[in-house]
Amino acid sequence: MKASEWIDISQPLNNEIATWPGDTPFSYEVSCTKEQSGSVNIGKVTMSIHTGTHIDAPFHFDNDGKKVIDLDIHVYVGPARIIDVSSMDSIGVKELQQFNLEGVERLLLRTSSHGNAQKFPDIIPFLCAEIAPFLSKKGVRLIGVDVPSVDPLDDKELAAHHQLFQHGIHILENVVLDHVQDGDYELIALPLALTEADGSPVRAIIRPL
């Protein structure tokens, strides 16, 4: 692969992809065929916003929070650093202090804890809320993880979600990082222009810097 080539770090969306328990399953179907319309196939998608690779908006966990359309799109495009935290059950300040994060605006964490997009995990590594001010001081504006949430799966308080956004750090979840090395990349992970949404699917791609 050439250094200038883009690498897809998104979960493919198909009818077999795992969803949060009790959430809307992903479904794609051709609702009108070329034979029926006389000219084109027309597809229909039904899904939860939080299926596959996606971003969270504050409205996801705060009724008064910003919706997707209100978010700064510049946050989702630019230099990013991938680091490996695969040996950690939880990621706090102590765990992150071993990495050089000065000036890093977008940080992607490889936990390598769950590589099967067709099965929802039973347990995931999670982010400790204490990392929000620590990362903010470093200059981080976006954090990405290769799991469905930055908080424990059964957590209702969502302390990491709240603290990250309170410190100006946006959230990207369910990226796929097992096939890429640690290092610095250019990231594009733009959300859709959804005016009322609490999150958005993204096509996340990177290329080495």
Swiss-Prot record:
GO terms for molecular function: arylformamidase activity; formamidase activity; zinc ion binding. The keyword Acetylation does not apply. It comes from the Bacteria. Binds 2 zinc ions per subunit. Keywords: Hydrolase, Metal-binding, Tryptophan catabolism, Zinc. Its cofactor is Zn(2+). SUPFAM superfamilies: Putative cyclase. It holds the Pfam family Cyclase. Transmembrane segments: none annotated. The active site is at H60. Substrate binds at W20. Zn(2+) 1 binds at H50, H54, D56, E173. The keyword Hydrolase applies. One of its GO terms (biological process) is L-tryptophan catabolic process to kynurenine. Its EC number is 3.5.1.9. Pathway: Amino-acid degradation; L-tryptophan degradation via kynurenine pathway; L-kynurenine from L-tryptophan: step 2/2. It catalyses: N-formyl-L-kynurenine + H2O = L-kynurenine + formate + H(+). Homodimer. Catalyzes the hydrolysis of N-formyl-L-kynurenine to L-kynurenine, the second step in the kynurenine pathway of tryptophan degradation. Belongs to the Cyclase 1 superfamily. KynB family. This is Kynurenine formamidase. It comes from Bacillus cytotoxicus (strain DSM 22905 / CIP 110041 / 391-98 / NVH 391-98). The lineage of its organism: Bacteria, Bacillati, Bacillota, Bacilli, Bacillales.
